[in-house]
């Protein structure tokens, strides 16, 4: 399995996890000229912009650490575009890390 396929499977798993917790998935792989958001969900009245990091077996680095300042900037840019075109709402940024050890959901990650 290549990196793209691994990432896609991670996003599918993360979306299923969020749905089981009562969230509604509004968009997947939302792209703009300067950024992409893996998942956009709604939890009550809050929009949740989710970055999914899938770590293949044997990788020990943290998915959260991979969401560096540059990556956060791209996600924020894409979120601004989404809010501009879909209307303002309360929002937060989450990171979901998927690894051989399981799934870890970090709310308000940045």
Tell where the protein language model's regions lie, with residue ranges.
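Catalytic cores of nucleic-acid endonucleases
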Residues: 54-101
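Acidic-basic catalytic patches of nuclease active cores, encompassing PD-(D/E)XK
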Residues: 1-28
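Residues forming the ATP-binding cleft of Hanks-type serine/threonine protein kinase domains
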Residues: 30, 53, 109-110
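Active-site metal-binding core of divalent-cation-utilizing nuclease and nuclease-like domains
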Residues: 24-47, 101
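Conserved catalytic cores of phosphodiester-cleaving nucleases, focusing on short active-site segments
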Residues: 18, 37-61, 75
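Short, low-complexity, polybasic intrinsically disordered segments
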Residues: 100-110
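Protein kinase-like catalytic core scaffold
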Residues: 46-48, 92-94, 104
